[in-house]
From Swiss-Prot:
Protein name, as recorded: Integration host factor subunit alpha
Span list, region Disordered: 49-70
Gene3D superfamilies: IHF-like DNA-binding proteins
One GO MF term: structural constituent of chromatin
Alphabetical keyword list: DNA recombination, DNA-binding, Transcription, Transcription regulation, Translation regulation
PROSITE patterns per UniProt: HISTONE_LIKE
Organism: Shewanella baltica (strain OS155 / ATCC BAA-1091)
HAMAP family associated with the record: IHF_alpha (MF_00380)
Function: This protein is one of the two subunits of integration host factor, a specific DNA-binding protein that functions in genetic recombination as well as in transcriptional and translational control.
Length: 98
């Protein structure tokens, strides 16, 4: 099961007593800030959570899996996420039942 933006807004409404509209706007604004920073080429560091980075990938040879035909995969910029140590520790603890 995936956590959605709507569920995040609902959680803000329930735990902080925010107006539902304000909670939804806050979640949207949070993700818009991340998108904007990445579009500007900036790294996004969320302390205790992890980092979103941009990585340039070179062009490389690929293959069409249906036809076996060689095709070039163009150079591109991708977003990567590196979880922070605190996040890793908490996820590992949750998965091992600690």
């Amino acid at each position: 099961m995936a956590l959605t933006k709507a569920e995040m807004a609902e959680h803000l409404f329930e735990t902080l007593g925010m107006n539902k509209r304000v909670a939804k706007e806050m979640v949207e604004s949070f993700f818009e800030e991340i998108r904007g920073a990445l579009e500007s080429g900036e790294q996004v560091k969320l302390s205790g959570f992890g980092n979103f980075d941009l990585r340039d990938k070179n062009q490389r040879p690929g293959r069409n899996p249906k036809t076996g035909e060689d095709i070039p995969i163009s150079a591109r910029r991708v977003v990567t996420f590196r979880p922070g140590q605190k996040l890793k520790t908490r996820v590992e603890a949750a998965n091992t039942g600690k």
